[in-house]
Amino acid sequence: MKANTMLFDTHLHMIYPDRLKYPWLSKVEALNKPYRLGNYLRSAKRLGISGCLHMEVDVAEAQIRDETALVSELIAQSGGLMRGAISACRPENADFPELLEWATTKVNILGFRRILHEMPDELSQGQLFRDNVKRLSGSGLTFDLCVLGRQLGLAAELVDHCPDVQFILDHCGVPDIKGGEFEGWAKGMSALAERPNIIAKISGVIAYADPDNWGLDDIRPYVEHTVQCFGHDRVIWGSDSPVCNLGGGLETWVAAIRALTDGWSTDDRAALFHRNAQAVWDI
């Protein structure tokens, strides 16, 4: 039996409703509750998670910097487990350059994300949006793309506009696994992977499967196609905890990804589980 490779979790959400407002959570009852550092630390220790990054949780726009302040506190309290943060941003706003300048003074901020999968398609097509994302060139800050399968073409357009920005595609492109979406998603992934400045995050895809009936063979084609498109050196792993609770939870997702990669070489497993992420963010 192979020894378990340590995991670096590139996609962790902390939910502190006593400190921040999360407008979208009122629509998702299963997630509309606190998820605090202590909850995660207990699971991480048991599951072999050796490090993690906090991913922004789409807080109210006025509280973006407040979320960063909270995460800085959590990093200090995590005993070295939490290594940095991907912060929220609004590239469609004229004050984005000011936010970027502020972010470069915060050693804990390693990148940005702007939620797109629940926004009008036109948002990422705006010239101001694209030019502001392009400002990340040379900064060392990454940009996470959270788009639906049908929006992969829009993601490709943005990536093309910003050839010197390192992009991260979240959640294998958010395929509708429960609905059986595959061919259109697969073509979009193949095309997007042709761009050298984007890598794919295999994170929490169990949340998009049938929560009551999914099995390994339901998510296997999506994981395998993602790796086939991007290669073993351009994929990273993330939990998407606690959103992965919609498909069974952190422990279930870790067990699933270990099972899906059981036939991989030790080197390829290490690349997915921690080495590629550590190289992207130099951590």
Question: Where in the sequence are the language-model features?
Answer:
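Divalent metal-dependent hydrolysis catalytic cores, especially in the metallo-beta-lactamase
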Residues: 26-33, 39-62, 80-90, 110-117, ...
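Short, electropositive alpha-helical surface patch
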Residues: 62-81, 165-169, 219-228, 251-260
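Conserved, mostly hydrophobic/aromatic
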Residues: 11, 52, 71, 85, ...
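Catalytic pocket-lining loop regions of alpha/beta-barrel enzymes
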Residues: 123-236
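Active-site gating/metal-coordination segments in enzymes
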Residues: 65-151, 157-159, 201-205, 209-213
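Mid-to-C-terminal alpha-helical segments outside catalytic/metal-binding sites
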Residues: 1-8, 31-51, 225, 229-236, ...
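Generic structural signal for well-ordered alpha-helices
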Residues: 37-44, 68-72, 96-101, 133, ...
